[in-house]
Amino acid sequence: MADTLEFNDIYQEVKGSMNDGRLRLSRAGLMYKNNKTGKVENISAADIAEVVWRRVALGHGIKLLTNGGHVYKYDGFRETEYDKLFDYFKSHFSVELVEKDLCVKGWNWGSVRFGGQLLSFDIGDQPAFELPLSNVSQCTTGKNEVTLEFHQNDDSEVSLMEIRFYVPPTQDDGGDSVEAFAQNVLSKADVIQATGDAVCIFRELQCLTPRGRYDIRIYPTFLHLHGKTFDYKIPYTTVLRLFLLPHKDQRQMFFVISLDPPIKQGQTRYHFLILLFSKDEDMTLTLNMSEEEVERRFEGKLKKSMSGCLYEMVSRVMKALVNRKITVPGNFLGHSGSQCITCSYKASSGLLYPLERGFIYVHKPPVHIRFDEITCVNFARGTTTTRSFDFEIETKQGSQYTFSSIEREEYGKLFDFVNAKKLSIKNRGLKEGMKPAYDDYADSDEDQHDAYLERMKEEGKIRENADSDESGDETDESFNPGEEEEEVAEEFDSNPSASSSSADSDDDTDKKKDAKRAKIVKQKKPRKKPEAKKTKDPGAPKRPMSAYMLWLNASREKIKSENPGISITDLSKKAGEIWKNMSRDKKEEWDRRAEEAKRDYEKAMKEYNTSAPTEASKKEKKTKGEKKKAETSEKKKQKPSSPARAAPKLNSESFKSKEFVSSDDSSSDDSAQKKDSEEIASTPASSAESGSD
């Protein structure tokens, strides 16, 4: 037979809520780990007194009774696993697995039996139901009744609030049966009563959640928070974990108490109790117990009189009374040297602590995520700025936690930590390892090339050019003075028959067509294009490098070897720091090299400039010749459309600009054309006068 047995999907009932987990049996005993809370229960083999196998709602289950009276129940076994468990308990624990059935008659009368921490309601010899007395929060008595109230679990959809037992009076004069029943319940119940004096009291401690200042009274079985408005009583059995976390400023400390079930303030539930301490606060603590009692109860963990920092006193007392280890940050160190990362969760900023077995975020709202709950993590670029990134965690329950606005410098440290803990990284395939991913952030500085911005600028220039071309065409087409004057003549001219006669209509249409053709042939004045950037002559000497750049080129590989995986920006920063701290003697060598390079450059430039003018003059002549050709071609195109065709057209259109008349007078045409143009020029004046009359 195997030395160990393991069972998955085994359920444990916790105040009405069924939590799944993993059960492991070994020679040393039995261990159960709750998947939801991560809480581990250990039962040594020597403590197991009795084991019962029975049919339950979730298949089959076992009930273990220990020598100390504690009861543990685990459900979810299959019927076929009975033989395997029977042999294992018998061979390794020397205990027989007894099979017992529950009574299903549905009667509401029977006998009550108290055994260990259980109240069993039996009908005949079979139990109908069992109540864990540790779940009882209050017990009150009436004339013939006993009422039990129970602690509530927020995770259970249906909860048992209270139950009443009718206790019939007896004929015996031995005592009150109702009172005896209540005393049996109270002796094992988890009823919080401040009986006796507190072990110690911490005055006016600053509490972040729930917010306020509270006096904390430490009792043997529970913690009492007394504030100005609210009081809380926290049983030590509800404490899951303790955390002691240093603040980023290294002057304060967080002490975090994880609770299940949480404490309530109205409709608000607090799963974490967070205390904030200053490292400078000291105190001397004296326990309200004798030396012998302190030694017997705490076995050297505490002393009657202690002195030290306030946060150390609180954490030591809590650790001894709750009997839980205090979790502190592991070996993670951020970019600034602290053990936490500044980030934002939901609407508030706080601190994220990478621990050895999980992450914890403080303080609003506090979040604790264990590594075994995590499905994968994701490093995402920040939404508002590229100087930060987001860290996303997805859990097996389907929840997602996004910690945003993390400084870009923390990326490498956090990535290494996640890699070392072997957590699955969701976007690892998108980039080849850590360095390219980090370079994505490094290349997004404001002074780096932004392709998107350049593209948008180009599109804007093209749009502006298109708009200006369209507006130019529109103005050219709309500015047709002949057509406008024709409309005015038809409406206001005293003798419009000359322009509207049938004999001249055909000639007018032909002239208009000729004008349109001339317009198509006519070339627009070329718009001045922005001068292109002067292309640098590849044969020209290169500018000399500065002393720093000469040193950087020589030392780059050395810096890379000393800092493996360093990014381009970090390498530049590192080099700048080294150069800044370098002594003047070492810098003189590189200054001398820079001076030599400068002299060589000046010498090369003189030689280059002596040969350069000949080439420049050739280019200049070439460009001048091209300009002259363009001017002559423009004049040729403008000549045919200006005097000959414009004159007959403007006979009917009755318009001629003054500039056009002067240019025609100065031309070398014959005298007949001169007279025609002068007559045409005089026509608008007479028409204008008649129109004005």
UniProtKB/Swiss-Prot annotation:
Residues 514-531 have a biased composition (Basic residues). Its main location: nucleus. Residues 571-606 have a biased composition (Basic and acidic residues). Pfam families: HMG_box, PH1_SSRP1-like, POB3_N, Rttp106-like_middle, SSrecog, SSRP1_C. One of its GO terms (molecular function) is DNA binding. The keyword Magnesium does not apply. Residues 467-493 have a biased composition (Acidic residues). One of its GO terms (biological process) is DNA replication. It is found in: Nucleus; Chromosome; Nucleus, Nucleolus. Residues 494-503 have a biased composition (Low complexity). Component of the FACT complex (also known as the DUF complex), a stable heterodimer of ssrp1 and supt16h. May also be a component of a ck2-spt16-ssrp1 complex which forms following UV irradiation, composed of ssrp1, supt16h, csnk2a1, csnk2a2 and csnk2b. The FACT complex may also interact with vcp. Component of the FACT complex, a general chromatin factor that acts to reorganize nucleosomes. The FACT complex is involved in multiple processes that require DNA as a template such as mRNA elongation, DNA replication and DNA repair. During transcription elongation the FACT complex acts as a histone chaperone that both destabilizes and restores nucleosomal structure. This is FACT complex subunit SSRP1. It comes from Xenopus laevis (African clawed frog).
